[in-house]
Regions:
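Short amphipathic alpha-helical "interface-anchor" segments enriched in bulky aromatics
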Residues: 400-435
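A short, flexible helix-boundary coil/loop motif
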Residues: 2, 67, 85-86, 125-128, ...
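Charged, often Cys/His-bearing segments associated with DNA-binding zinc-finger transcription factors
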Residues: 2-82, 491, 495-496
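Active-site-proximal, Lys/Arg-enriched surface segment
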Residues: 149-234, 241
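An anionic, glycine-rich sequence signature occurring as long contiguous blocks
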Residues: 3-4, 309-413
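Electropositive, glycine- and tryptophan-enriched low-complexity nucleic-acid-binding patches
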Residues: 212-279
């Protein structure tokens, strides 16, 4: 295979596979000898079913479905209490389904990862599904999804998000996340994303842009959302808050539209109002290193870690390069995972901004350079890779805190990107509108976030983690849903299981 232009034969391909296996083993042994953790691939097991007979499968299905519903029911008192406060503008004489029952149905729709209103009508109204669901919710009456859509069109859908924040607040109050905190702060990652786009304007709130279409341009209408999630070092990402872009929030006279930074200010205000006393650390991407954002964080008494890109804040970069020569003790080397890391920081950098430089912020800047070894994709050669990460911080760095602030906090900003990707590509249909009524569209979005919120503690719970590891997250949700649409459940067993004491414990 020395000639790159020649196709390898089967023998050479087989030989390369063997070489790659041996090289991989040698690399892992080397990393182990150096005290590095090469990590384990989180692939699902490739084996036949472990159930010996139908009885074993039934027991597993009953246990999984019931424990999933127990976790949901543990949240139900908070959900129902808050949902009951939402004003129902419908005519009471014509109401068949209560508001809270309709919204619980909407949450279940996303807990089971139903992909559309048509699928909800088709799948969630099947007699066997309803019979099984009534084992957990005896009074539930499944409506047509259009009924839910009409309700979402007329109620204050922002109150649905308030339900989500109330449920998160309850978990925080019960100290469910206390073991994952870093320096007793809750890390909130904030990131913007596009929900969907259309070529026609279907609501006046849509943002617009010009896109190329061959030799011409055309107007495209889109919906962007700024999301906030609680993120933790174990990878858990808890949906928290959403802020929609809105054409009316921009300057309509100058046609300067709403943007992510404006949405951040609105979201930050609501987040502070919802959690006024919570110790929060926000982690933000390279769009946010600017004075107004830091002002908002400091006004709210939030810690922050913000990605700093090469061309952002040139005066801060210049100050860093000058001061690092005088602060040679501000260096730290460590191993993390399979990587060698070198940290270098400068504290107390003055950042001047605003009209005539009248405003100033004192910030702290760190650079993390890291190297690691991995196998080349097309050979058995071991390559050395390198990367660099830069952040600015609210608090000064030291050898005692640089690992926590960078590796355990700032890097987990990626958790929200992973969480949004899960909602877009792994069952929650983030990019599906569900309705072309703006209010209803937002309502379905908030219900989706609530459904995701219910599922996250379930897949990290002690009672379900084994089956989640067996089937994967989507496989587990599909396993539960398949159980509920078939005659797997034994009513006396389920009733006894539901009657036992239950406490949510996370791994």
């Amino acid at each position: 295979m020395s000639n790159p232009g020649r196709r390898p034969g089967n023998e050479e391909i087989k030989e390369l596979k063997t070489e790659r296996i041996e090289a991989g083993k040698a690399l892992r042994e080397k990393q182990k000898a150096e005290g590095l953790d090469g990590g384990v691939n989180a692939a699902l097991p490739n084996r036949k079913s472990g159930y010996e007979n139908v009885k074993e499968e039934q027991e597993a299905r009953q246990s999984a479905a019931t424990d999933q519903m127990r976790i949901l029911k543990s949240q139900l008192p908070v959900l129902l209490k808050r949902l009951s406060k939402i004003k129902d503008p419908r005519n009471p004489k014509k109401v068949k389904h209560k508001l809270d029952a309709l919204l619980i149905y909407g949450i279940l729709m996303f807990v089971f990862q139903i992909s559309s209103r048509r699928e909800a009508n088709r799948e969630m109204t099947r007699p066997q599904f309803i019979e099984n669901l009534k084992l957990f919710f005896p009074k539930i009456d499944i409506p047509h999804n259009d009924t839910l859509m009409r309700l979402l069109s007329v109620i204050e859908v922002d109150e649905i998000e308030a339900v989500l924040m109330e449920a998160v607040h309850k978990l925080i109050k019960n100290k469910k996340f206390s073991r994952y905190l870093v320096d007793n702060h809750y890390t909130v990652a904030i990131d913007g994303t596009q929900k969907f786009k259309r070529d026609v304007i279907w609501a006046e709130e849509c943002s617009q842009r010009e896109v190329k279409d061959g030799d011409r341009t055309r107007t495209q209408y889109h919906v962007n959302v700024l999301e906030a999630n609680l993120v933790f070092p174990n990878g858990m990402s808890i949906p928290l808050m959403s802020e929609f872009s809105d054409y009316a929030q921009g300057d309509t006279e100058t046609r300067k539209q709403d943007c992510e930074l404006k949405a951040f200010k609105r979201l930050a205000k609501r987040l502070k109002e919802a959690f006024p006393r919570l110790s929060i650390r926000v982690v933000l991407d390279g769009l946010y290193p600017n004075g107004p954002v830091m002002e908002v964080c400091r006004k709210n008494r939030w810690d922050f870690m913000i990605v700093l890109q090469n061309k952002s804040l040139p005066s801060v970069w210049e100050e860093f390069e000058g001061l690092k020569k005088l602060q040679t003790e501000n260096r730290f080397r460590r191993k993390w995972g399979n990587r060698h890391q070198d940290f270098e920081w400068v504290n107390h950098i003055e950042y001047v901004y605003g009209p005539n430089g009248r405003k100033r912020q004192i910030i702290h800047m760190v650079i993390c350079r890291e190297t690691w070894e991995e196998m080349a994709k097309d050979s058995a050669e071991i390559e050395t890779k390198a990367s660099r990460h830069v952040w600015i911080s609210h608090k000064p760095f030291s050898k005692e805190n640089v690992h926590k602030r960078c590796n355990l906090c700032a890097r987990h900003r990626w958790n929200i990107e992973s969480g949004i990707l899960v909602e877009k590509r792994q069952g929650y249909c983030y990019e599906h509108a569900f309705s072309y009524n703006w209010n209803a569209m937002k309502g379905y979005h908030y219900l989706m976030r609530l459904g995701h919120f219910i599922n996250v503690p379930a897949i990290y719970s002690e009672c379900l983690i084994d089956i989640v590891r067996e089937f994967g997250v989507r496989g587990f949700i599909r396993f539960v849903r398949e159980t509920l649409v078939a005659p797997w459940l034994n009513a006396p067993w389920v009733k006894e299981r539901l009657g036992a004491n239950f406490q949510l414990r996370l791994i």
